[in-house]
């Protein structure tokens, strides 16, 4: 990802238009200049709003952070920190769908539907021909506090007390990754929105015993951790599996947004009386009958990668739009469910097993009663 304000292009220096767009977006939220005096600075007032004043801004947990708190004996969660941020979700709202080539964002997608035209009228191809499709996650800070009887999970744009972990900006595939075969026969990863009738891209475990239409346009599965690393390396050294810190960062954003550890809680698109999100992302595809799923396509991925684009989810989350799969049930009727989407990321949980870089869970006995978790230093070259 290129986050430099000035970059080289065809041997010439130019301003990075994407960084300028981000700056312009931020300037829209500045207060007007009425009553501003010489020497005034931009501060956050007691209500959590940007304002001009003479006092230096000192970020605190109350004015510059938001999070959740729960007791150690149960998961009874309350919101803590700046209530305005809980309503406006400034960090979560900076997750944006984009098309990117290697480490550079080519353009951001329409936030209300990625298949929709951009502001300049351009209709983006989402099949990988113009670049990979992903979600750009912004830089922010997060930390976990132990108060003795309670835990706290915080996020902020500031390392308030020096204990926050910096989450560098990164791009995550908009769904579990697909693969394609190059001319030299090697398989490489790519991220795109592929329709179910696109015969070029066979997903799942590519089994010849499964009808091709039940695998087309789906993520790649049925491979080992080493194979996944190999497919990433075949694409280039700029792409890796998601690492443990990034995975935790995404989970933290969702936990705090809904003030709920149960991502699968029932969908509720209404806000609370305080203007907060509630509920969860819904069950997604976790409620599939295992035997029926096995009979349908051998427990390969169910939802095509084009689904969010087709339903204009954009940068949003689960909205109740249903996914219908013809002739799925034993009586010939259709499967009807709705996939779990978080901020444009399709199947945020529960569809297939996920590899996470830098963490290994080792089962110590055959009954899986005791497991050890080993976390190594992040290896992603930020």
Sequence positions of predicted segments:
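Short, intrinsically disordered N-terminal pre-domain segments
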Residues: 1-17
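Short aromatic-cysteine micro-motif
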Residues: 124, 128-131, 155-348
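Single conserved hydrophobic/aromatic residue that forms the stacking wall/gate
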Residues: 373-382
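Cytochrome P450 core scaffold surrounding the K-helix E-X-X-R motif
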Residues: 361-369
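GGW-centered surface loops in extracellular recognition modules
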Residues: 57-136, 142-144, 239
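Short linear proline/tyrosine/threonine-rich motifs used for host-factor recruitment
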Residues: 50-52, 78-80, 187-191
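Acidic glycine-/aspartate-rich tracts in secreted/extracellular proteins
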Residues: 46-48, 140-142, 177, 246, ...
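Extracellular repetitive beta-rich solenoid segments
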Residues: 25-57
């Amino acid at each position: 990802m290129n986050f430099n304000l000035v970059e080289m292009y065809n041997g010439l220096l130019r301003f990075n238009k994407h960084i300028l767009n981000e700056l312009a977006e931020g300037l829209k939220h500045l207060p007007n200049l009425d009553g501003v005096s010489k020497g005034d600075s931009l501060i956050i007032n007691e209500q959590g709003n940007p304002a001009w004043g003479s006092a230096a801004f000192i970020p605190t947990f109350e004015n510059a952070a938001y999070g959740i708190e729960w007791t150690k004996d149960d998961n009874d969660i309350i919101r803590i920190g700046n209530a305005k941020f809980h309503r406006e979700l400034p960090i979560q709202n900076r997750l944006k769908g984009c098309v990117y080539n290697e480490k550079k964002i080519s353009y951001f997608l329409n936030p209300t539907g990625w298949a929709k035209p951009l502001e300049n009228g351009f209709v983006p191809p989402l099949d990988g021909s113009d670049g990979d499709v992903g979600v750009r996650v912004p830089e922010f800070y997060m930390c976990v506090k132990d108060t003795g009887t309670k835990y706290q999970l915080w996020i902020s744009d500031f390392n308030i007390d020096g204990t926050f972990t910096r989450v560098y900006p990164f791009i995550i595939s908009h769904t579990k990754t697909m693969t394609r075969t190059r001319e030299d026969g090697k398989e490489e990863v790519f991220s795109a929105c592929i329709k179910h009738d696109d015969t070029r891209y066979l997903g799942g475990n590519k089994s010849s015993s499964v009808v091709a239409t039940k695998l087309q346009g789906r993520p790649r599965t049925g491979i080992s951790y080493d194979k996944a690393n190999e497919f990433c390396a075949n694409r280039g050294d700029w792409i890796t599996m998601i690492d443990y810190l990034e995975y935790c960062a995404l989970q933290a954003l969702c936990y705090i947004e809904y003030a709920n550890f149960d991502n699968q809680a029932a969908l509720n698109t209404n806000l609370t009386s305080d203007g907060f999100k509630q509920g969860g992302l819904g069950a997604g595809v976790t409620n599939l009958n295992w035997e029926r799923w096995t009979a349908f396509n051998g427990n390969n991925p169910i939802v095509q990668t084009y689904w969010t684009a087709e339903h204009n989810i954009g940068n949003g989350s689960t909205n109740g739009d249903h996914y219908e799969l013809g002739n799925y049930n034993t009586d010939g009727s259709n499967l009807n469910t709705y996939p779990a989407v978080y901020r444009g990321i399709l199947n945020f949980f529960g569809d297939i097993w996920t590899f996470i870089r830098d963490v290994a869970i080792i089962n110590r006995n055959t009954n899986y009663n005791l497991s050890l978790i080993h976390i190594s230093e992040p290896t992603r070259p930020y």
